[in-house]
């Protein structure tokens, strides 16, 4: 059957001319491309308008964020708890990082005056035994050629307190050497360097787009889990009390029957 089909086909020779393209089809494709270009232009204009609106409301939100930070400072270990409760960020904090984060008073994300040109993340600490700086800032600048330039504060560690260098350690019963990478290693990574726009910093993006807008959501996760544990303990305690009451009642009935 296959051989018969092959016989029915005309072999194509090198000298065979391609079928002429339908002029009407070409014209339709050209018109479609014009429409598509028009749609792209409208999309770009819409994007610019959205960014203008976002920039306007960034100014409106700023004093609200300032008030929020004042309240957060009154809650012990707020940012440490929020970080640890976050499914991604919680994995970045080593035990040493957690000790330092107890001194973290505020996190601030600030878009550039031209919102398309970048943003900065600033961590503000109370005076602490780990480093001299009270403010650590990491800035991302976007250029017209879609490159990203990163600048970060050089942390001035106090003597013997530098935990930003990866530490090698072994677990008991495990011969493998494991690397304990500090959050502050990320903070100083890629500093004063440029890279392609597509190679975004996932940690910075999560802080900016997820943690920063509503950190209370993650702080409450931990708080609600503690409340659930307390409720579970209360339920177990109530069950134990009921069992004891039943046993006492049963013993009382037995004593009555004997009498």
Curated annotation (Swiss-Prot):
**Which family is annotated?**
Belongs to the nucleosome assembly protein (NAP) family.
Task: List where Basic and acidic residues composition bias occurs.
Answer: 1-15
Protein role = Acts as a histone H2A/H2B chaperone in nucleosome assembly.
**Protein name, please?**
NAP1-related protein 1
**Which residues fall in a coiled-coil region?**
21-62
* Any GO BP: double-strand break repair via homologous recombination
Has the keyword Chaperone been applied to this entry? yes
Say if the entry is tagged with keyword Iron.
no
Give an example GO cellular component term for this record.
Answer: chromatin
Which InterPro entries does the record cross-reference, listed alphabetically?
NAP-like_sf, NAP_family
Q: Where in the cell is it found?
A: Nucleus; Cytoplasm
């Amino acid at each position: 059957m296959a051989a018969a089909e092959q016989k029915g086909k005309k072999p194509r020779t090198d000298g065979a001319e391609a079928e002429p393209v339908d002029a009407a089809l070409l014209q339709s494709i050209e018109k479609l491309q014009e429409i598509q270009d028009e749609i792209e232009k409208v999309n770009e204009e819409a994007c610019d308008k959205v960014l203008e609106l976002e920039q306007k409301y960034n100014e409106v939100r700023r004093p609200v964020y300032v008030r929020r930070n004042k309240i957060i400072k009154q809650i012990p270990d707020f940012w440490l708890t929020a970080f640890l409760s976050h499914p991604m960020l919680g994995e970045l904090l080593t035990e040493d990082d957690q000790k330092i984060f107890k001194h973290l008073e505020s996190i601030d994300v600030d878009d550039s005056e031209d919102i398309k040109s970048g943003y900065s993340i600033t961590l503000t600490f109370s005076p602490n035994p780990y480093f001299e700086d009270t403010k650590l800032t990491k800035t991302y600048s976007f250029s017209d050629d879609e490159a990203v330039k990163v600048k970060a504060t050089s942390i001035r560690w106090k003597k013997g307190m530098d935990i930003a260098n990866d530490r090698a350690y072994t677990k008991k019963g495990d011969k493998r050497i494991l690397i304990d990478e500090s959050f502050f290693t990320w903070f100083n990574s890629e500093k004063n360097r440029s890279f392609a726009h597509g190679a975004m910093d996932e940690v910075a993006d999560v802080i900016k787009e997820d943690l920063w807008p509503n950190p209370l959501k993650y702080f409450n996760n931990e708080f609600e889990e503690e409340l659930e544990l307390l409720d579970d303990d209360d339920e177990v305690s109530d069950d134990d009390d009921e069992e004891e009451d039943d046993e006492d009642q049963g013993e009382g009935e037995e004593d009555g029957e004997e009498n």
